[in-house]
């Protein structure tokens, strides 16, 4: 048996991971993470195979995708979706947790970038992490969204509080 991570997989924090949408080849790898929940940041339906695997593994899927009929794929994820997602990320009851979108680049990168901003990371480091996962496909609108995100929309405490 081989253990192949999903595209753009990365560890964000202990028991918090990010990636693109997994395929059947990635299931053995993901099983090793013993995930409790997956946040899916896309409006698209998940494959029946993936949904069946989630049920078998007793992993809760939380879909926070914007309505595809009303948003351009080039626009950043909405502020409401980011705030909802960050509330889930800040709750240790949801861990181990995977944040994913189709390719693990833009929506996931924006969500993790806003988390890093809450943690007090400097903007250069946040954008470097975003670009590492987005590669040459990075989007300036997403970077601007992260830069201008209002951290006061998400109350934090403990390990998530910026110094």
Specify the residue positions occupied by each region the protein language model found.
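Cys-dependent protein tyrosine phosphatase-like superfamily
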Residues: 1-99, 103, 110-163
């Amino acid at each position: 048996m081989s253990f192949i991570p999903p595209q753009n997989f990365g560890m964000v924090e202990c028991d918090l991971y990010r990636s693109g949408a997994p395929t059947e080849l990635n299931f053995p790898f993901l099983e090793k993470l013993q995930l409790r929940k997956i946040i899916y940041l896309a409006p698209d339906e998940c494959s029946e195979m993936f949904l069946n695997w989630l049920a078998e593994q007793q992993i809760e899927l939380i879909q926070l995708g914007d309505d595809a009929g009303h948003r351009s794929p080039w626009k950043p994820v909405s502020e409401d979706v980011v705030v909802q997602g960050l509330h889930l990320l800040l709750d240790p009851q949801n861990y181990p947790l995977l944040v994913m979108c189709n390719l693990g680049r833009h929506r996931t990168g924006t969500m993790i970038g806003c988390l890093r901003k809450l943690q007090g990371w400097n903007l250069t480091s946040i954008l470097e992490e975003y670009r590492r996962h987005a590669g040459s496909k990075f989007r300036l609108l997403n970077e601007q969204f992260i830069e201008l995100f209002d951290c006061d929309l998400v109350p934090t405490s403990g390990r998530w509080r910026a110094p």
